[in-house]
């Protein structure tokens, strides 16, 4: 199906390029109901033969009449739809002016009844720069948005991170970046229902219109709407993991000829558990084990979160639209407790001492981002978009840490206690202008400019408790002021002819940064200009065979918190450090691939990182302190080969399989020696999707994802198996939907990490709260055929917000 789509698309684009030399025809007809009454304002749309590419569209007049002009000789698919009627579809061969006479639409008692033929379009679509995962009307849409990403081919969600294979991914919704901290992003995706999602695009080669630091992109496409009216829903989910957690929410959408209004709210209450076993081998100058520290760490997180999203569109006239988007997240209650019990032995496992550390943190934060957007459409189909964005982010954390120390006889002999107070206020202002011009039927041009400013003011105060009184620790108290300005411009050109498609883009960014450590009286500045080209090309060799390739250069800037020189204590022997000397990381990404025999795809890729930014645990063998600090690797290379198979054994069963064999190598110089590590690994996914019962009202999805032993940030991560089963069933005349999902069926998603190079030797086993069962219910009311204008705020700079921890 994928190859056939590419073939027809190429033929169509080729035909359009010679439109001036070809004869044009028309299609006309009259739409009536079963009572022989004209159906006014019915949507009449012409697609390519396979129904995937839109050509022309119109609406019927008051007499039910329609006419589509300027059509070339070809085979088309015509679709006619109107609220309350079953859709009409017919394949037509156009070789002259065609009058379809009278077309009758039959009434249907269910407004959603027509959305059942899921198997007519493929689940997976591949393009030179992206993979499109279509999930509309599957069981996945009754889970959370995070669950959808976990089932998306190539995407790995683990330990609060979202990666496309080994590369961190940036999340967009309807081409607008989700601007939250990493923790907030996970909360949002877990609490947001997936019922409005149409597809997920995994973009490995984003065009130049994306910021250069976007890297690999996950773009969540929401269903679009052509119908006026009101729609709403209310939903709730209950999840049982180690502890119970629940989520409730409601969505409301209204549309008329002048206004689109969409409001979403949800509330999440959860307690998350995490158990961790750590082993650190502290070494002597000869790199022989001197002491072994074994720690059992239990982490519990309690939180209450409110999410509110507002989208408003005002259609001034046919050419001008004004939009307002606002996203707010408020966390009034967040408690984070760490209980640590560490036993210390010598190399022969003889007990030497132990200590306990209890860390209790309480957070309060809000994050509000808003966009004001104006769009003007020109008569030549070009458009001009102005976008202004503002974010305000406020974060506070109070922490209490108590450590008790025991001697060789396990007798208490000392204790220490300290408190910290951390604050961070961030403001982001951006403005951009984008211009898009269709040059002709086969080519288009895009260009744009952007300015962004980020200002962060943060401080931390450490208070030692001595004889019951708080005493400021000046060596670990500080204030940090950060200011960043980025000026950017881009252009993009795309062209299709005969059996070729090409896209060329270039982006330039000028960055100016100043970071001031107030207490240390240190100022660090960076000023650099970078060029970021990208290109993708595809060629249809045969009807069922195509080849493609792409290249993109991108940048990863350090987060504002990573550049902050603060020292944040988890306990007396474990700290998190910022690094004001971090520099940006650059990535060159090459890819070639082929689609053949309709069901198969083979790809090869190569990614070279210069200065990849990673957070490493570094042990000090003299002070017995573990420091987690971000640093730049000298070099990282990731290359591999992918094989994909997408097939429908029946019209109600889709089978998708992909396997990837890849190698990651990392190099770093820490002063005491040069480190070079590499590891071959395998990533495989097997996904089965079923639509059951006569009305296709029961949907089932089962996914297995295997991630073999691999290298991440100079650490070896052992094999893991991710699994998820999701089921959904429509009830109450298709107004209600019951969903059930189970994750980590085989209890194999936990992380087992090992680190060993130079004078570093440690391991960690992390048992996360990712094995659970979730039960959900959603009830729809109003005009359920409506789809929303849901989107999120767009300032890419918000993605680099991080909490102080």
Q: What is each PLM-predicted segment?
A:
Residues 157, 178-204:
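Short acidic/polar hinge/loop motifs at secondary-structure boundaries
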Residues 428-432, 473-478, 583, 589, ...:
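Outer membrane beta-barrel strand-and-loop segments of large Gram-negative receptors
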Residues 211-218, 226-277, 303-306:
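Outer-membrane beta-barrel translocator/receptor signature
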Residues 49-65:
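Short, acidic Ser/Thr/Gly-rich low-complexity loop/linker segments typical of extracellular
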Residues 32, 43-47, 81-85, 95, ...:
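Short, acidic, small-residue-rich periplasmic hinge/interaction motif at the N-terminus
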Residues 307-331, 354-516, 544, 600-604, ...:
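Face-selective signature of the C-terminal outer-membrane beta-barrel domain
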Residues 512-514, 543-589, 604-625, 745-758:
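Surface-exposed extracellular loop regions of Gram-negative outer-membrane beta-barrel proteins
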Residues 100-104, 146-148, 187-188, 202, ...:
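N-terminal periplasmic accessory domains that precede
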